[in-house]
């Protein structure tokens, strides 16, 4: 049985979260994406403390597909440094 992992990311826009989730499922890179939110995030960025509403995305996949999933997220994610 393959090792199953969960990948978590946050995104500032529900439609973008759904677009990424849909692409990952369509490309058969993941079994499931769950999107919840909005959540409130407080974080340090470029020397300051920021706050933002975000959408929480839980991604379920095989460990062997992690690099492909990460690459797709990086290509489609709006953040300079996707979490």
List the predicted regions and their residue ranges:
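Positively charged, small/polar-rich N-terminal and surface patches that mediate targeting and assembly
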Residues: 1-83
């Amino acid at each position: 049985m393959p090792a199953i992992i969960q990948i978590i990311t946050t995104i500032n826009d529900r439609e973008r979260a759904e677009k990424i989730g849909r692409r990952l499922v369509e490309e058969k890179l993941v079994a499931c994406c769950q999107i919840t939110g909005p959540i409130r995030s407080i974080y340090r960025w470029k020397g300051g403390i920021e706050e933002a509403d975000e959408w929480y995305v839980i991604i379920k996949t095989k460990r062997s597909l992690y690099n492909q999933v990460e690459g797709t997220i990086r290509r489609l994610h709006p953040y300079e440094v996707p979490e």
